[in-house]
């Protein structure tokens, strides 16, 4: 039988990782032991938090039964929503397979809690590209702008801090809802910590106490030991094919928060008079529970992968956001290559490391909702899942790629090493 380390080296070699790349990665990994230990501690806390919420709400095998048709009296669906509310510190929750993605969840939360004549304010700069059409920044059918809902935006200061003076000036009698995007999206600004989100919410409510503060929590669940609801957010929104689905949920989104806000969203999702009472869970409810149970552990692996990627590419001279030493507040790692070929090579490496479609070569394409070609690498069990190992980005300067996910740390590690291998083979990096 082979020595364990030798066997691992040979397995990496079988997968196409050279000794030079593996040695470089191993030296970086050794530097990260203390940070990895802290990630494990956070995962343990969040795992216990999820279990406590499940036990409090008496989750049973009956909860896994599929419902169909109207979905009246769906025990599993209703119990899961109480689990989400308790785990995230909210009054109520809407967790449904009928919410198709994160953008849908955000659109639902906005459209159900805003009325013609209201104004939406983003105090953290431009939102995700896909939200531009929801809001009406880029004209689109059914946007908020078409319904007479206006939009205001205050950019972050050059150092990434909130522009408190600008925010104060922007809040007016029409300001009904403030949207706070936690993650950076396709930008290189810092991701917001829960603490900073709490400070921003407190400032906004000191000016206008009745304003609704909504946090787009995509990519942020279970990264810290607290969530935005616990620091004053009225609504928190996310996708089940990101962190809270644990890689098992095949579809879905959630909205948690104040009861009135969640009820408004439920009536918009279904219809007035029906709200949360309808909406069959079909055959996915067990995967929703099991994915949520596994989510803290899955997120910990994704975090390790993000830090590993940052450290490796920082050592090679690339700009990385966050850098290799910063605290983490989401699972996304941005690497600026300033080179189209390097960006594409990175994505090819992520795809080549996948268990699914590893033989496919990703290419830039005109993805709906974006104003430039986008390249995506994602050999995932669930199409579009970004808690699974994936990388993507708009193919335009500074040619920044956004890496995230990995259902296990070891798969995330392989993906990063494979990305490095592709760059190394094409003489786009030197490992000296």
Q: In which residue ranges do the predicted regions lie?
A:
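Structural motif
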Residues: 92-95, 118-121, 176-177, 210-213, ...
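Conserved C-terminal alpha-helix-loop-beta "cap" of PLP-dependent enzymes
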Residues: 314-431
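Conserved PLP-enzyme active-site core in the AAT-like
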Residues: 2-29, 33, 40, 50-56, ...
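Solvent-exposed, charged/polar functional surfaces in cytosolic regulatory/catalytic domains
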Residues: 83
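Short glycine-rich or small-residue beta-strand-to-loop segments that form or flank ligand, phosphate
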Residues: 63, 67-68, 94-97, 331-336
